[in-house]
């Protein structure tokens, strides 16, 4: 049967005044975010306070990692806590109501997440996902940049919580307590060239993220 594709402009959400006010001046941002999410589902954030230098450095570190020999990367293979390297063709996402993904994804990914100290009760109990990251030992400065990037994006996400609350007509402080011990999940992905994708084959199949917010750098 024939299908049509509807194209919509992505909304640009300007956080400049909001961040400059320390989060006190919400203005019309909640309404803008709600409209964007209800009508498109994604939006551009501008004047977000993340430096161009940091974005440049994280892309450079991603290239450095994915340029490593295959055996160096697979030595850090993803573990039961979902931290580590995932080879191309190893995953098939299923969280989508729009497409039944039947082929394995072609992307390669190195996964990092919030680290928890040995005194964390969940980690002491052996609860899954509460662990330390796996780090390559032959990339000087890599861990520092990845950690800085994750901490910076986490900070931005927390600053945006009052906007999400207001967009849902909730008190501005509503989400704060739920993110005091947040879990940040960072996928450092690489999409190697594929001469021709097969039918229903994707670099990363259609899916819905399970986290509260997802940031994609451009």
Language-model segment annotations:
Residues 1-218:
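Peripheral, non-catalytic segments flanking oxidoreductase cores
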């Amino acid at each position: 049967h024939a299908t049509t594709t509807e194209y919509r402009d992505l909304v640009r959400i300007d956080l400049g005044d909001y961040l400059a006010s320390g989060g006190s001046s919400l203005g019309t941002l909640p309404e803008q975010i709600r409209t964007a999410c209800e009508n498109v589902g994604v939006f551009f954030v501008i004047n977000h306070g993340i430096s161009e230098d940091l974005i440049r450095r994280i892309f450079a570190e991603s290239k450095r990692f994915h340029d490593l020999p295959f055996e160096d990367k697979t030595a850090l293979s993803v573990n039961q806590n979902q931290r580590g390297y995932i080879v191309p063709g190893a995953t098939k996402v299923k969280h989508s109501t729009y497409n039944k993904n039947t082929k394995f994804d072609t992307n390669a990914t190195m996964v990092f997440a919030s680290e928890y100290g040995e005194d964390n009760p969940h980690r002491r109990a052996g609860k899954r996902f509460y662990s330390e990251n796996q780090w390559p030992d032959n990339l000087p400065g890599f861990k520092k940049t990845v950690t800085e990037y994750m901490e910076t994006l986490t900070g931005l996400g927390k600053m945006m919580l009052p906007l999400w609350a207001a967009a849902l007509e909730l008190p501005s402080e509503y989400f704060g307590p739920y993110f005091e011990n947040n879990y940040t999940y960072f996928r450092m992905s690489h999409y190697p060239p594929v001469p021709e994708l097969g039918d229903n084959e994707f670099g990363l199949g259609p899916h819905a993220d399970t986290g509260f917010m997802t940031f994609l750098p451009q």
